[in-house]
């Protein structure tokens, strides 16, 4: 059962940014998760609430709208948790990519929505051509490229369109808002090298909160969003 409530045992969970706009989106996500079992229909139903958050001004703190030169993501990319369900079933975060910088090619492993709050991004989406049995290699081809402007967003329904990278094409850093059905920066996902076909496990981490380290777990590489 998803934990969208307010009783959390650690300050790194729950509403890290507690504003009416964020609470409204999380409440609507909780309602639709209860009432709409079909993932595609649920994501579609979330579009109005997500669009409202993207169009609202003043709710994102300046501290979570800046590049992070010390981030394990590299490239000055900041990834800031805004809300995290204690059971790992949902997160909301901002991704700040400096002008001209880009993320590695990566996946998300969760349904959700991603939209641009400030600036402009180019997204390149990949299609996987192999059957995925070899965890260390993948054959990818570009499925599409498009520009995402402020207020525009797209959906994730893995495995469809789950592998991509984004690049800031505005003169100032871009900020995208991500609502995803896992604890994205703390789960082990995949980073891809389309040229060589190499796939590597990675965990991007947040810039403002720490991921819990399971006992005896190996540390994974950083990068992605």
Indicate residue ranges for each PLM-predicted region.
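Short acidic-glycine-tyrosine-enriched beta hairpin
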Residues: 128-163, 205
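Long hydrophobic alpha-helical segments typical of transmembrane helices together
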Residues: 192-225
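N-terminal leader/capping segments at the start of a protein or of a new domain
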Residues: 1-58
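A short hydrophobic beta-strand segment most commonly corresponding to one strand
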Residues: 113-115, 171-186
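A short glycine-rich, His/Asp/Glu-containing loop-to-beta-strand
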Residues: 73-99, 153
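Glycine- and acidic-residue-biased ligand/ion/polar-headgroup-sensing regions
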Residues: 110-129
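Ligand-binding loop in jelly-roll beta-barrel domains
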Residues: 158-177
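Conserved short histidine dyad/triad with adjacent acidic residue
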Residues: 93-107, 157-161
């Amino acid at each position: 059962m998803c934990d969208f409530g307010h009783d959390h045992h650690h300050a790194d969970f729950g509403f890290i940014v507690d504003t009416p706009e964020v609470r409204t989106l999380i409440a609507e996500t909780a309602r639709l998760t209860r009432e709409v079992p079909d993932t595609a229909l649920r994501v579609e139903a979330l579009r109005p609430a997500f669009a409202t958050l993207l169009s609202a001004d003043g709710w994102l703190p300046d501290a979570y709208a800046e590049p992070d030169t010390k981030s394990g993501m590299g490239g000055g990319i900041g990834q800031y948790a805004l809300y995290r369900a204690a059971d790992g079933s949902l997160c909301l975060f901002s991704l700040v990519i400096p002008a001209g910088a880009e993320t590695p090619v990566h996946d998300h492993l969760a349904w959700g929505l991603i939209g641009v709050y400030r600036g402009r991004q180019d997204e390149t989406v990949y299609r996987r051509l192999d059957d995925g049995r070899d965890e260390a290699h993948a054959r990818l081809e570009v499925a599409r490229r498009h520009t995402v402007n402020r207020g525009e967003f797209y959906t994730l329904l893995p495995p469809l369109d789950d592998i991509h990278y984004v690049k800031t094409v505005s003169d100032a850093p871009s900020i995208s808002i991500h609502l995803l059905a896992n604890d994205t920066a703390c789960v082990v996902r995949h980073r891809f090298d389309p040229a060589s076909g190499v796939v590597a496990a990675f965990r991007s981490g947040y810039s403002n909160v720490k991921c819990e380290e399971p006992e005896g777990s190996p540390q994974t590489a950083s990068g992605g969003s």
